[in-house]
Amino acid sequence: MYSDNTRSALRRKHARLALLAGAFIAAGPAMAADNEDWTFNGGPYLWGAGIRGHVGHGSTGTQFIKSDFSDIAKTVDMSVMLMGEARRGPYSVLTDLMYIDTDTRNHLPGGAKLEVESKTASGFLGGGYTVLGDDNRRLDVAGGVRVWYSGTTLTFHGGPLGGLSGSDNATWADAMAGLRGHYAVNDRFWLSSWGMAGAGQSREDWDLAALAGWEFFPGFSAVAGYRAMGVNYRHDGFVYDIVQKGPLLGISGRF
C-alpha cells in the first residue's frame, strides 16, 4: 500500500511524464518541418498580354485604350515575367516580377489618333501556407504586397487636339491575399493556379492564372497557361485603370 504522500508524488510524476510526452507529440510535425530542406522553383516567362482600360493625367485627360492579342506584334516592345517560389514544409515564400513596354494607337472621332506609350513594372513579395493536401496536391492560402510603377505618354495626332502631348508616372503599393493550388497529374505533368485580390493605394488589384507544366528534363518544366491582371489606380489626375490578359509560355526550374 502506498501512503497519501507517495500516491501524490506518483501522480505528479505521471502528470509530468504525460505533459512531456504530449509536448514531444505536438512538436513532432514542427521538428519534422524544421528538418526539411528548402526547395526552390521558378523561371522566366513570355506573356502575350492584351491591354484594355483607361489611362490619363492632368494635361491630357483620361482616354480609353485597347490592344488585343492579335495586335501584340505591333504594340508590345517587351513583355517578360519572372516567378519564383521557395518552399519548406507547409511554408512558402513567393516572388513575382513583371515588366511590359507597349506603344498603342487608337482611333478617335474625326480621324484623329491617340498614341499611348506605356512602361509598367510590378513586383510581388509574399508568403503562403498549405492548409490542405500534400506535395502532390495542395491548397495554400497566400498573402503579400504588390508594388506597381507606371509611366505613360499620351500624344494626339490629327484633329483639334493634334500635337497635344503629356507624360506622367506613379508608384503605388497594394496588399494582396488569396489562394494557390497545385496538382501533380503524374511524375511529369502538373497543373497550377492562383487567385489573388486586394487594394491599398489603388482602388482594386487582382491577379488570376492557370498553368500546365511538363517536366521534359529532371528538374526543368515547360510551362504554358493564361494570366489576367487588373488594377485601378487614380491619384491627382493620374489614371491607370487597366486589365491585362493573355497566354504565357516559359521555363520553370526546380532546385
Language model segments and positions:
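Cleavable N-terminal export/targeting peptides
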Residues: 1-38
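Short glycine/proline- and aromatic-enriched beta-strand/turn motifs that initiate or cap beta-hairpins
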Residues: 32-101, 184, 250, 254
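Residues that define the transmembrane beta-barrel architecture of outer-membrane proteins
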Residues: 36-38, 76-80, 119-123, 137, ...
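Residues on the lipid-exposed face of transmembrane beta-strands in outer-membrane beta-barrel proteins
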Residues: 42-44, 82-88, 125-129, 143-145, ...
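Transmembrane beta-strands of outer-membrane beta-barrel pores
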Residues: 46-50, 88-90, 97-103, 131, ...
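Flexible, solvent-exposed loop segments that connect beta-strands
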Residues: 54-70, 101-118, 149-169, 234-240
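Repeated loop/turn-to-beta-strand initiation elements of outer-membrane beta-barrel proteins
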Residues: 90-93, 134-139, 187-191, 219-222
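Outer-membrane beta-barrel translocator/channel fold
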Residues: 222-255
